[in-house]
C-alpha cells in the first residue's frame, strides 16, 4: 500500500481559516455503511442521530501555547515548538533555525529567560528552561498557540478559546483534538437529555501530528509516538454500554488511537477487549487493520496522504471514504481543523462487540 493511494485534490478555498461563530453550527456529513446514502446535516443534529444508551468518548487533553521565539548567541533567530513537557523545567521540542543548535548552546527567549539545549532525541531537541515560573504555567502567558501550518494567519485572542475544547482539562497537547471543537455546552446538555453518556480518554496530541508521511511505501513509515491514558472508569463505561446494547462513538481519531492502543487479547476475550492503559503509543492504523473498539466516530476532514485519512479509510473502507470526500468537496464543506465534520459508521457492524 502506498501513500499516493490516499491522495485527493482539494480546492484551497475549502481549507477553513477560522472557526464559525457557533461551534455546533458546523456541517456534519453522515456516512452510514454502504449502500445507504450520505446525508448532509449539522453537528447540532447529533441528539437526533444518536440513541439513549449510546456512549460518546471525548479526548480531554488541553492545548498548551507551545510556540516560542528566541535568538542564539550568534544572533540567529530561532523558533521553538514544544512537543512534550517532561517535568523539572525540561521539554522535548522541535527547533527551527538556520543552523541546528548544538548541545550546551543557550537560546535567549523573546518572552524572557533562556533555554539550554541538552541534546537530541531523534528529530527533537531536549531543552532545559531557566524561567521565573514552572514551565507549564509560564507558557500560558509566554507561549503562542501553535495553529496548524495550513492556517495561513497569526493566532488571535479568539483562538485561545476556540482552538480548545470546552471539556479540555489535562494539559499537554500541542494540537487540538479537532472533532471535539464542535461541541458546546448547549449541545452537550441536549445530548445528556437524550440519554447519551459521556466518557473521556487523554491523548496528548504531539507535534508529530503535523509531520507529513515522507515515504511512499507505507510499511517504511515510522509513526510518531504520543502519550495516552485510558482509565479503568472508561473501560467500565464501555462494558456497561455494550451490555445494554448501546453504541460506542469516538469523538475524533485521537480517541480511536487511544482505544485501539488499549485493546488487549485475554483468556476471556480471545478477540480482544478494552483494558486500562497509560503510556506511549506508536500505533499506525491503515486499511487492513480492523478497528474493534468503536461503532462510529465523529471526525473532521483530513489532509491528503495523511495517517489520519488512512485511519478513517481502515474504519469505513477506502472507496466509501473517497466517495464521501468527493461529496464534501462538491457540496463545499469546510476542511481540516476549523472545518466541518463527519459522522462515520463502521463498515463492519458488530465488531465493537468483540466479534471476529
Swiss-Prot record:
Keywords of the record: Cytoplasm, Queuosine biosynthesis, S-adenosyl-L-methionine, Transferase
Pathway in which this enzyme or protein is active: tRNA modification; tRNA-queuosine biosynthesis
GO cellular component, one term: cytoplasm
Gene3D superfamilies membership: QueA-like (3.40.1780.10)
Statement: the UniProt record of this protein carries the keyword Manganese: no
Disulfide bonds: none
GO terms for MF: S-adenosylmethionine:tRNA ribosyltransferase-isomerase activity
EC number: 2.4.99.17
Function per UniProt: Transfers and isomerizes the ribose moiety from AdoMet to the 7-aminomethyl group of 7-deazaguanine (preQ1-tRNA) to give epoxyqueuosine (oQ-tRNA).
Assembly and binders: Monomer.
Stated name of the protein: S-adenosylmethionine:tRNA ribosyltransferase-isomerase
Chain's gene name: queA
Amino acid at each position: 500500500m502506498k501513500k499516493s493511494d490516499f491522495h485527493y485534490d482539494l480546492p484551497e478555498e475549502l481549507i477553513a481559516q477560522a472557526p464559525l461563530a457557533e461551534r455546533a453550527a458546523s456541517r456534519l456529513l453522515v456516512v452510514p455503511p454502504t449502500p445507504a446514502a450520505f446525508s448532509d446535516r449539522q453537528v447540532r443534529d447529533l441528539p437526533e442521530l444518536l440513541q439513549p444508551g449510546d456512549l460518546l468518548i471525548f479526548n480531554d487533553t488541553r492545548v498548551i501555547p507551545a510556540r516560542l521565539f528566541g535568538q542564539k548567541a550568534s544572533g540567529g533567530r530561532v523558533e521553538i515548538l514544544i512537543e512534550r513537557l517532561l517535568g523539572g523545567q525540561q521539554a522535548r521540542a522541535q527547533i527551527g533555525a538556520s543552523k541546528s543548535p548544538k548541545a550546551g548552546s543557550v537560546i535567549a527567549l523573546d518572552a524572557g529567560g533562556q533555554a539550554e539545549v541538552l541534546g537530541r532525541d531523534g528529530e527533537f531537541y531536549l531543552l532545559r528552561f531557566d524561567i521565573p515560573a514552572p514551565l507549564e504555567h509560564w507558557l500560558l502567558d509566554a507561549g503562542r498557540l501553535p495553529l496548524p501550518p495550513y492556517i495561513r494567519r497569526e493566532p488571535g485572542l479568539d483562538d485561545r478559546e476556540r482552538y480548545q475544547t470546552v471539556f479540555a482539562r489535562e494539559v499537554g497537547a500541542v494540537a487540538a483534538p479537532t472533532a471535539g471543537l464542535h461541541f458546546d455546552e448547549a449541545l452537550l446538555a441536549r445530548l445528556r437529555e437524550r440519554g447519551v453518556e459521556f466518557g473521556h480518554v487523554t491523548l496528548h496530541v504531539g507535534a508529530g501530528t503535523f509531520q507529513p508521511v515522507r515515504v511512499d511505501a507505507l510499511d517504511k513509515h515510522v509513526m510518531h509516538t504520543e502519550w495516552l491514558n485510558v482509565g479503568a472508569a472508561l473501560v467500565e463505561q464501555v462494558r456497561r454500554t455494550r451490555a445494554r446494547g448501546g453504541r460506542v462513538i469516538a469523538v475524533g481519531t485521537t480517541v480511536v488511537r487511544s482505544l485501539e492502543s488499549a485493546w488487549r487479547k485475554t483468556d476471556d476475550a480471545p478477540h480482544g477487549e478494552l483494558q486500562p492503559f497509560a503510556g506511549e503509543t506508536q500505533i499506525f492504523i491503515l486499511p487492513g487493520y480492523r478497528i474493534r473498539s468503536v461503532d462510529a466516530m465523529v471526525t473532521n476532514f483530513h489532509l491528503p496522504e495523511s495517517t489520519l485519512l488512512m485511519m478513517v479509510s481502515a474504519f469505513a473502507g477506502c472507496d466509501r471514504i473517497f466517495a464521501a470526500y468527493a461529496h464534501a468537496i462538491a457540496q463545499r464543506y469546510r476542511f481540516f481543523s476549523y472545518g466541518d465534520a463527519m459522522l462515520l459508521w463502521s463498515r463492519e457492524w458488530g465488531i465493537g462487540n468483540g466479534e471476529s
